[in-house]
C-alpha cells in the first residue's frame, strides 16, 4: 500500500484562493485537485499492511499542540524559468510545520523510514511534466499576496492509489493535536 503522512488543507478561504490562482495562471500543467490539497510531512512509499499497523502505533505516540499556518506567495521548483512544481508558500507557522515533520520522522526512523530530503513547507498547486516556459512574470505578481490561514489540529496517515485521472487518497488514521 502506498502511504504518506500529511496535514490536509480544509479551510475554505485557502481552498478558494488556490482555485482562483489555478484558474488565473496560464500554465500548461496539471492543477492539483482542490479536495487533494495537503502538506506531505513524510512520504513512506509502498508499505506492507503489517508495517502500517506499526506506523500507526508510532504516530499515535506523537504529541503536538494545534497551531496556525498562513499562506503567502507563489513559487516554483526547481525555478520559475524551468518549473516542474508550482507552490504556495507558508509564512506563519512555518517553523512549527518543520518541527512537526521532524517529529514524524523521528517516530518512524526506528521502523526503517527516512526522508530523502529535508521538509520544505510548501503547498503544491500545479505539477508540470513538459517544459512550460518561463513563468517568472506570471508568479511574481503573487510574491507578497496572502491566501488565507488554517489551524493545524491533526495529521493523517493516508493511502494513495494512483490512477490515470490522478491520485485517490483515503485516510488510514487521524492523529489529533493534544
Residues of each region from the PLM?
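Histidine-dependent nucleotide/RNA phosphoesterase domain, centered on the 2H-phosphoesterase fold
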Residues: 1-178
